[in-house]
């Protein structure tokens, strides 16, 4: 069991999704101060009335940091964690998007459990209808785990190194390596060890890179199926292969190369021979925009291999422009194709 005085601060990153944010903050603040010390929201330059709504807090535990520009999810989480540590120095930080929230009672379960011996805890994240949320499934690095490597090599794909239904329905803890920032409980020791996410990533991959970094430094991360979260994430269909906002393809592929290098070590270069042809075949799913998609993915591969993170978001939006006006920037939506 956590010490009775263990402090927990939730951080939420939001951008133009006020309806989701209202539900998430309502759920969080339903927990008393003994369960939740504070909630810190980073408003990523929202233009939908979020700032006005947050300016009238109904709970003194709610604190708001407003960014004058959109930092993306990665920049938002870096800022949120830095501010949470500076303002509260909590025992635990709980991370989530504006559309992710603990199920009722989840924080009580966290405090009631023995959390010693682990630096971070990953929740079991489901859709509101109870289905496992695939994008939030914790993973085991197959390059560090022989059994996971062999399962993946034998055609298991993502199933070879991600937790599955049996892990979610059981009661046993599982040691994991890669975790999303929806329902991740980070201890003070974890932050002292691993520091903060790299905001230059902008969107995609910052969570997996951060948790892999924590593991590489000796931190321990446990998946606890009793810690239940919901992710009201419905903008993607399982069969989808096309980026609806083309600029996201740049960040997805650039950052994935950086994740692969961090996970694979010296095996990164042989693995690349299998990865790159698969990526280039995605061009066929972008009829009418193939030239733009190819331009973005070529730049992504170049920057990812060089581990360059200095491209501005304005540059990437310019690369993604076609003859039509570019769509809105919606970092929080995570709309896009399946991972990989």
Kindly label every feature range from the protein language model:
Residues 141-177:
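Short, flexible, basic/aromatic active-site loop/helix in glycosyltransferases
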Residues 17-32:
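Short, well-formed alpha-helical segments that are part of the catalytic scaffolds
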Residues 67-87:
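Glycine-rich, basic loop-to-helix element that forms the pyrophosphate-binding segment
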Residues 247-248, 252, 265-340:
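Non-catalytic, C-terminal membrane-associated alpha-helical segments of glycosyltransferases
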Residues 89-99:
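Short beta-strand-to-loop acidic/aromatic patch adjacent to the donor-nucleotide binding site
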Residues 178-179, 183-195, 200-227:
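A short, conserved alpha-helix in the catalytic core of glycosyltransferases
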Residues 105-141:
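Conserved donor NDP-sugar-binding/catalytic core segment of glycosyltransferases
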Residues 43-52, 69, 100-101:
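A conserved acidic beta->alpha catalytic loop
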């Amino acid at each position: 069991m956590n010490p009775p005085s263990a402090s927990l601060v939730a951080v939420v990153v939001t951008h133009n999704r006020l309806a989701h944010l209202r539900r998430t903050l309502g759920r969080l603040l339903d927990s008393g101060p003994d369960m939740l010390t504070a909630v810190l929201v980073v408003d990523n330059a929202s233009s939908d009335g979020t700032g006005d709504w947050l300016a009238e807090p109904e709970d003194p535990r709610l604190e708001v940091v407003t960014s004058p520009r959109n930092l993306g999810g990665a920049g938002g989480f870096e800022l949120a964690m830095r501010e949470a540590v500076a303002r509260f120095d909590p025992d635990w930080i709980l991370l989530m998007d504006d559309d992710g929230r603990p199920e009722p009672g989840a924080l009580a379960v966290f405090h009631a459990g023995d959390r010693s011996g682990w630096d971070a805890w990953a929740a079991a994240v489901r859709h509101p209808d109870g289905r496992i949320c695939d994008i939030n499934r914790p993973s085991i690095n197959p390059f560090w785990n022989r059994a996971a490597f062999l399962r993946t090599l034998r055609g298991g794909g993502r199933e070879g190194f991600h937790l599955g239904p049996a892990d979610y329905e059981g009661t046993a803890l599982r040691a994991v390596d890669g975790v999303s920032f929806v329902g991740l409980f980070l201890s003070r020791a974890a932050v002292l060890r691993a520091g903060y996410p790299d905001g230059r990533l902008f969107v995609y991959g910052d969570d997996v890179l951060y948790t892999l970094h924590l593991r590489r430094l000796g931190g321990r991360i446990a998946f606890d199926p009793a810690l239940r979260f919901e992710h009201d994430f419905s903008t993607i269909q399982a069969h989808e292969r096309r980026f609806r906002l083309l600029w996201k393809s740049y960040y997805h592929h650039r950052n994935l190369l950086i994740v692969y290098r961090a996970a694979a070590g010296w095996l990164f270069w042989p693995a690349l021979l299998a990865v790159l042809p698969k990526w280039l075949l995605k061009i066929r799913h972008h009829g009418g925009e193939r030239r733009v998609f190819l331009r973005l993915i070529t730049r992504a591969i170049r920057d990812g291999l060089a581990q360059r993170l200095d491209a501005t978001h304005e540059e990437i939006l310019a690369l993604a422009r076609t003859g039509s006006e570019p769509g809105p920037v919606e970092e929080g939506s995570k709309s896009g194709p399946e991972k990989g």
